[in-house]
Amino acid sequence: LRDHQILDVKGDWHDKRPGLRPGAWAFQYRNEHYPDTDDSSVVAMALDRADSDENRESVDRGVEWIIGMQCRDGGWGSFDADNTHYYLNHIPFADHGALLDPPTEDVSARCISLLAQRGYKTDHPAVAKGVAYLKRTQMADGSWYGRWGTNYIYGTWSVLCALNAIGEDPQAPYIQRAVA
């Protein structure tokens, strides 16, 4: 997996994050211009668990990229940062509504899970902003949406796992609302 880490190609994400070094993984082969935060978080977690000493440099670089890709609202999009120009979904050829890459709860949960595994706590700014984002985006019924798993069960379990990993109180009212 280390051999597939993108360390020298600055993709479209670099437009919004020009000072950020590459350090991510793509969903598919030969797609160096479009790495994503979701798969990068999972790969970094796997490398960290496999042999944290041998993989430390690679994982650290991945974590740096993940933190750098956090959106202003505290969440994470998949391929880009702050790509939330919703008006674009209303132009005639945007009938599939996928011209954007807004932050989503499931992807944000994966990024927070990586940070938790690496020892980050809720007092770290990226984690604090991420948890605040998840609290704001919780649905009235207690669930969270999962864009990439495309349902509320997927989104909710993803978020609950991340909140557990980061040490949120399972008795907190918002967590209890999710499991009720």
Give the label of every model feature segment.
Residues 1-180:
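Preference for long, amphipathic alpha-helical scaffolds in soluble/luminal domains
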